[in-house]
């Protein structure tokens, strides 16, 4: 109440921002007569003039009014469209690195051209990021004439693009592409073996379309490049027979003979004691577990992994809801957009378990080679902005995670859509029947088009079946009709059109009342002016008829977990001041109601004795549903924040490794770098045999001489030196041994020649760095999966993770240096032909690498993650990791019998 009172006196922050921006809009409008008087040539010549002024020190903020006026005039001449004042406000918002919330149909694509043009003047490149390839290609082609008129180049990136074409696209002033492609190109650029192979030229400025979908819905999505691991398809096939013999326990804490308990909120399963015993017996009968062995012994944890994946595949993942089968493959369905995601695979064995369940060919698992998340990738940009129709409900998260303010842009015309109260039914069948009846009522009253939003493919097909029974012609838009998507949406506003759509989020195409006459014209072969006039006249009549019938009617078949997704569905109606109606139909069996709405509401409704075809409409129920959505949103925000704390640790390490890699690629010679490695490795090696600040009697000189001979192939008379010079202490010995080793390395280097030596050094350093970074990622993943258990020991898991991750990282750097020094010391001097062959092999390895799109549905620190089958042609072996003991003198956990410092802790 106090906040609203203060807002009433001083105005809200959004109102103050709009007031400030309107003053800039006045400056732009004042320039319009002058700019309009310019010839086409003079208007185009403004771009090089702006670039020169920028290079002379004038800021983009100073150039903004004139640049926006030029862009608006060019759009009028080239595209026949003039930016409204509200679009100018949106353009200012984007330029200032904020999120512009603009209603559907208000012209976000045209608005984005303003910020693109202004920021492209710096010459550092602008990235326009969309949710799919279709929208990237469409928007690029739509805006190409405008930007080319203004003298700017435009490029588009997409998957499986030719390297030369992709490199050219990144060199363009403005580059369009998907969030996945930009993210994977970043990872791929950090796996190349020469700077010439890198595609991106820095992350300067990005405009993200549907920013809420990418930065919120997909925030937990890790981008992963992976290679094939060992084949264990026989295990998945065998263990797939177990879940059908099990049954779930209804409640977590109430034993009822069930074998496992399902946590639908976390999307996980936990086996009960009976479950353990039953599974163990099944595995013993299969010969996968020895008699008397425990399923949870260290040697059998792999079986636990397979059993858990199989149970989840059978009981948590449903066909036509979470995935579809197409051409003998399991294709994931994005829960946020309803789109299929070919090439993406769940990891942790889940995808293989689903393949086994469906009786399909089981593809090998993958091992992570490089990874980042959208949260961390997009925070690498110097300036980030976004546009969407729905971001205000997530404004707090946008600010806290990304530092992005949300500015709500006013509509060009007032919104007159009628948003009606929800109707709640006893069960799904009653709800579906009510929806069909409502459609029939609307059809009887006029020609209003109807859009029905569903949350799953299954629901869309149930409604489609009922509409067929009622004899109502309709179109279905879900993952299975992906190819016809744009055409279906283009005509969804036609008179009497009935369209069922699974999750309208991110569809990217406006629904025009009366249909889209231009789309119809484009389908005609050799259309004539008469065809155009006929279709346009027909549309004008249809448009008027639909307006008279009340505009587009939106029917939501259930509430989503996020209010934002519901708002996106509603936002399809009422564009640009058009009329429209929206209403949601719910049932007590809907997932949101069943899991989150609360037992009190459900019990109250059942107690009312409602019949299947009766609905209630009550503020308390609507409030309860909204509270449930708020709970889910808050829970998901907490999960994303928690994950980010852990991933920030990985991200800092990633930035160090990638920065180091770039330095290695940029240097002509690594001699100084490698010699420093020699000194550090010698110091660590000597410390293993001559402990710091120890007396001579504690020195293992013979062991040191053996290590130098075995590891480096160097015979050094260390004992003789000590006998000749009794004053030679530990520090002096380190210096003398290092000097000797480096002197011998320089001799070998001289024999090879500078060019060959530099090539060999780069080969060994990059190979070692990439190999151990890959193993480090596996170790970090292993650490993260178990770190929450530290909480039971009254330790802070986050702090423990940071400490352990630091130890792993330092250990990895030491192993990399040791590997490089050992390899360079022992390798025979290669011929020029052998060096050329090594370089070719590196290139082949890079080219063999395919990107795997990973879609993480993480609802905690562990969860299902997807990985693509497209991976390395060569299989990657799995690296076993061990915990770091408190003392380096403690026995190594691997069981070798050696001290940790002489085994897996060897630096």
From Swiss-Prot:
Keyword NAD included in the entry's annotation: no
Record's keyword terms, sorted: ATP-binding, Cell inner membrane, Cell membrane, Cytoplasm, Membrane, Metal-binding, Nucleotide-binding, Protein transport, Translocase, Translocation, Transport, Zinc
Record InterPro entries: Helicase_ATP-bd, Helicase_C-like, P-loop_NTPase, SEC_C_motif, SecA, SecA_CS, SecA_DEAD, SecA_motor_DEAD
GO molecular function annotation: ATP binding; metal ion binding; protein-exporting ATPase activity
UniProt keyword Translocase, yes or no: yes
Reaction equation(s) it catalyzes: ATP + H2O + cellular proteinSide 1 = ADP + phosphate + cellular proteinSide 2
One GO term describing the cellular component: plasma membrane
Entry's EC annotation: 7.4.2.8
Mode of membrane association: Peripheral membrane protein
Gene3D superfamilies listed in its UniProt record: Helical scaffold and wing domains of SecA, P-loop containing nucleotide triphosphate hydrolases, SecA, preprotein cross-linking domain
Classification via CDD domains: DEXDc_SecA (cd17928), SF2_C_secA (cd18803)
One GO biological process term: intracellular protein transmembrane transport
Cofactor binding note: May bind 1 zinc ion per subunit.
Protein origin, superkingdom: Bacteria
Function, as annotated: Part of the Sec protein translocase complex. Interacts with the SecYEG preprotein conducting channel. Has a central role in coupling the hydrolysis of ATP to the transfer of proteins into and across the cell membrane, serving both as a receptor for the preprotein-SecB complex and as an ATP-driven molecular motor driving the stepwise translocation of polypeptide chains across the membrane.
PANTHER family, sorted: CHLOROPLAST PROTEIN-TRANSPORTING ATPASE (PTHR30612:SF0), SECA INNER MEMBRANE COMPONENT OF SEC PROTEIN SECRETION SYSTEM (PTHR30612)
Protein's recorded name: Protein translocase subunit SecA
């Amino acid at each position: 109440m106090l906040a609203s009172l203060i807002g009433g006196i001083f105005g809200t922050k959004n109102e103050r921002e709009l007031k400030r921006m309107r003053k800039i809009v006045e400056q732009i409008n004042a320039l319009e007569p002058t700019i309009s008087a310019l010839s086409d040539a003079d208007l185009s010549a403004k771009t090089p003039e702006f670039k020169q002024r920028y290079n002379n020190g004038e800021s983009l903020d100073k150039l903004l009014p004139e640049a926006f006026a030029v862009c608006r005039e060019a759009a009028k001449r080239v595209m026949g469209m003039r930016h409204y004042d509200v679009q100018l406000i949106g353009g200012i918002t984007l330029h200032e690195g904020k999120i512009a919330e603009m209603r559907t149909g208000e012209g976000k694509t045209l608005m984005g051209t303003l910020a693109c043009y202004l920021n492209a003047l710096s010459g550092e490149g602008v990235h326009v990021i969309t949710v799919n390839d279709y929208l990237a290609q469409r928007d690029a082609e739509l805006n190409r004439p405008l930007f080319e008129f203004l003298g700017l180049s435009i490029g588009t990136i997409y998957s499986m693009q030719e390297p030369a074409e992709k490199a050219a696209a990144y060199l363009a002033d403005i580059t369009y592409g998907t969030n996945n492609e930009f993210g994977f190109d970043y990872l791929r650029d950090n796996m190349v073996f020469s700077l010439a192979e890198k595609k991106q030229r820095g992350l300067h400025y990005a405009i993200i379309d549907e920013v809420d979908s990418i930065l919120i819905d997909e925030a937990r999505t890790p981008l992963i490049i992976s290679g094939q691991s060992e084949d264990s398809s026989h295990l998945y096939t065998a263990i797939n027979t177990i879940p059908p013999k099990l049954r779930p326990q209804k409640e977590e804490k109430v034993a009822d003979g069930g074998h496992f308990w399902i946590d639908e909120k976390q999307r996980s399963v936990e086996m009960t004691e009976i479950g353990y015993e039953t599974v163990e017996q099944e595995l013993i009968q299969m010969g996968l577990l020895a008699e008397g062995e425990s399923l949870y012994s260290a040697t059998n944890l792999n079986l636990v992994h397979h059993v858990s994946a199989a149970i989840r595949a059978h009981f948590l993942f449903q066909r036509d809801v979470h995935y579809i089968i197409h051409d003998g493959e399991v294709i994931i369905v994005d829960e946020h957009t309803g789109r299929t995601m070919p090439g993406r695979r769940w990891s942790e064995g889940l995808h293989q378990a689903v393949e086994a369940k469906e009786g399909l060919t089981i593809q090998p698992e993958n091992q992570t080679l490089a990874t980042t998340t959208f949260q961390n990738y997009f925070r690498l940009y110097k300036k980030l902005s976004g546009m969407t129709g729905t971001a205000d409900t997530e404004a707090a998260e946008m600010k806290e995670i990304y530092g992005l303010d949300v500015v709500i842009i006013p509509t060009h015309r007032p919104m007159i859509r009628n948003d009606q109260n929800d109707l709640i039914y006893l069960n799904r069948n009653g709800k579906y029947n009510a929806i069909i009846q409502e459609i029939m009522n609307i059809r009887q009253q006029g020609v209003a088009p109807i859009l029905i939003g569903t949350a799953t493919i299954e629901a869309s097909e149930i409604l489609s079946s009922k509409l067929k029974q009622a004899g109502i012609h309709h179109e279905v838009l879900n993952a299975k009709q992906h190819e016809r998507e744009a055409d279906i949406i283009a005509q969804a506003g036609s008179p009497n059109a009935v369209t069922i759509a699974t999750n309208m989020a991110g569809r990217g195409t406006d629904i025009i009342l009366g249909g889209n006459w231009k789309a119809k014209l484009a389908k005609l072969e050799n259309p004539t002016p008469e065809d155009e006039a006929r279709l346009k006249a027909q549309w004008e009549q249809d448009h008027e008829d639909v307006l008279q019938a009340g505009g587009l009617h939106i029917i939501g078949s259930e509430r989503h977990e996020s209010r934002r997704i519901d708002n996106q569905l509603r936002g399809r109606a009422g564009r640009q001041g058009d009329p429209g109606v929206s209403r949601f139909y719910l049932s007590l069996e809907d997932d949101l109601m069943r899991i989150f709405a609360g037992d009190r509401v459900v019990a109250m409704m059942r107690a009312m004795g409602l019949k299947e075809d009766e609905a209630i409409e009550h503020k308390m129920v609507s409030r309860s549903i909204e509270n449930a959505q708020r709970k889910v949103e808050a829970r998901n925000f907490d999960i994303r924040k928690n994950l980010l704390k852990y991933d920030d640790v990985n991200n800092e390490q990633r930035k160090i490794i990638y920065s180091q890699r770039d330095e290695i690629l940029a240097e002509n010679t690594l001699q100084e770098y490698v010699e420093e490695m020699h000194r550090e490795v010698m110091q660590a090696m000597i410390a293993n045999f001559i402990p710091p600040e120890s007396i001579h009697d504690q020195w293992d000189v013979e062991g040191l001489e053996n290590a130098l001979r075995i590891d480096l192939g160097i015979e050094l008379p260390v004992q003789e030196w000590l006998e000749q010079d009794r004053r030679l202490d530990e520090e002096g010995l380190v210096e003398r041994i290092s000097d000797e080793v480096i002197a011998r390395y320089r001799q070998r280097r001289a024999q090879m020649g500078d060019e060959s030596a530099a090539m060999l050094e780069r080969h060994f350093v990059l190979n070692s760095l990439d190999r151990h970074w890959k193993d480090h990622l596996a170790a970090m993943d292993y650490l993260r999966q178990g770190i929450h258990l530290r909480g039971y020991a009254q330790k802070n898991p986050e702090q423990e993770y940071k400490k352990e991750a630091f130890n792993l990282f330092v250990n990895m750097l030491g192993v990399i240096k040791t590997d490089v020094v050992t390899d360079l010391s022992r390798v025979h001097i290669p011929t020029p032909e052998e060096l050329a062959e090594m370089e070719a092999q590196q290139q082949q390895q890079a080219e063999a690498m395919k990107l795997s799109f990973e879609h993480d549905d993480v609802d905690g620190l562990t969860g299902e993650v997807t990985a693509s089958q497209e991976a390395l042609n060569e299989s990657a072996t799995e690296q076993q990791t061990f915990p770091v003991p408190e003392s380096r003198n403690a026995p190594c956990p691997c069981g070798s019998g050696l001290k940790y410092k002489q085994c897996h802790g060897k630096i």
